[in-house]
Amino acid sequence: MNINVADLLIGNHILLLFVVLALGLCLGKLRLGSVQLGNSIGVLVVSLLLGQQHFSINTDALNLGFMLFIFCVGVEAGPNFFSIFFRDGKNYLMLAIVMVSSAMVLALGLGKLFGWDIGLTAGMLAGSMTSTPVLVGAGDTLRQTLTDGKSLSLAQDHLSLGYALTYLVGLVSLIFGARYLPKLQHQDLPTSAQQIARERGLDPDSKRKVYLPVIRAYRVGPELVAWSDGKNLRELGIYRQTGCYIERIRRNGILASPDGDAVLQPGDEISLVGYPDAHARLDPSFRNGKEVFDRDLLDMRIVNEEIVVKNNNAVNRRLSQLKLTDHGCFLNRVIRSQIEMPIDESIILNKGDVLHISGEARRVKSVADRIGFISIHSQVTDLLAFCAFFILGLMIGMITFQFSNFNFGIGNAAGLLFAGIMLGFLRANHPTFGYIPQGALTMVKEFGLMVFMAGVGLSAGSGITKGLGETGLLMLGAGLIVSLVPVVICFLFGAWVLKMNRALLFGAIMGARTCAPAMEIISDTARSNIPALGYAGTYAIANVLLTLAGTLIVIIWPILGG
């Protein structure tokens, strides 16, 4: 039996799609030096090569892929989007606007200078910024504005060609820029990070190892009574001195949870809750021959919960104002927009921030009720909310405006992005509404993106050889300019106009470019994770602005003429 693989793939679009995805994902794992190609560029290269051989898939798959991707981008941005937009994140908002607008202006200017069409220009912008949201926004707007089928097909082919040619240029140049720009600017990022650390009471070099607190019980002897000197627990401040807190006291056979007025007496048996290293550092007056093993004292359930910040008495307040240790709880991590932040007592909490808190179950529940809610640890997605807001996004995308003789539609990209932001925002405020496990959200987003890239590459592959011959070197040079010049502009704006700390500034610049590999290099250069504060500040808003940039560049292009 002879099987013609080409005929098999041509006759089965689903099989072709998954073959492209599998080969592209394998290619994406390859490295050029320290730079990994990545899934997006791997799938795009494979689909372009197969597209040259006249393989194709139904455009409905491409459209569904981009819709799923952009909707999930909105859901991820939603919890922190409005807090960044309206509050003290104005510096980060301005940096993101400067980055995206300067890149768009440069792309428009270079496109007109070299006589390219809007497809090549928008593709070059998307690739240089290593931003799939730009590609998605531009592709959707092209389908709205170009009514002639031949012109639309050519523009879409050029869009994917421009992206494919400049993506690696944008990624590699930004990674090298992250490594060498601080040195060229004579910026001492470790010193800048230490300055922020001193101002905010952080240890910039620490890599926190997270443990569950442990419970140990001790009998109060003369040494401990002498150490306490008749002070009550509030006055002693045991947590500040030991890193542990007293959860229970047994006195004269009676077990109780002490309040701040309790005074230690000889013969008391106390249970202490704290991290293992805190127990190891206890003063000998606690430990020497005094440890006891009592089921009632030790029988407590220690939990580690993810608490979502929601309530007004926590939002826009400093972390230190929560006084978690006064409530017998320990803070392990602070997560914002899926980015782990340095544990900074002066950090201002945003709605939707996730605090990883451990302690005795009852105390953790009390803290959660006070500041927000415990995140649902469920693998079940609220598909009804997902579908309802997806439909809402499509309906919003149908809205059109008319200015004189010019019609402008919001489009599916902007509509779905807005609906996704609203779903993410509502999820951060209502614990039982619209729940989507992070793993499921990431999977749908990545799958949608890969399907979109496969469709784009297959449709554009037939014209890639001609396009390379006409624009190859010019496109690479233009991509390098659009990749690096906005980074320099952002640095000058942040340093001289906003007067930002350099460690935070470089982190914010990488967030505005939504480039995690470059962020890792900045953190390594600073020998600290403090730049993550800046990265988180610009990341969510930049994803939204980049999608809008893809839409705007297509709308502005015919207005410029030429």
Swiss-Prot record:
GO terms for biological process: potassium ion transport. Its main location: membrane. The chain crosses the membrane at residues 8-28, 32-52, 66-86, 94-114, 158-178, 383-403, 406-426, 440-460, 473-493, 503-523, 540-560. Coiled coil: none annotated. Keywords: Cell membrane, Membrane, Repeat, Transmembrane, Transmembrane helix, Transport. Gene3D superfamilies: Regulator of K+ conductance, C-terminal domain. InterPro entries: AAE_transporter, RCK_C, RCK_C_sf, Transp_YbjL_put, YidE_YbjL. It is found in: Cell membrane. Residues 202-288, 290-373 form the RCK C-terminal domain. HAMAP family: YbjL. PANTHER family: K(+)_H(+) ANTIPORTER SUBUNIT KHTT (PTHR30445), TRANSPORT PROTEIN YBJL-RELATED (PTHR30445:SF10). Belongs to the AAE transporter (TC 2.A.81) family. YbjL subfamily. This is Putative transport protein ETA_21820. The lineage of its organism: Bacteria, Pseudomonadati, Pseudomonadota, Gammaproteobacteria, Enterobacterales.
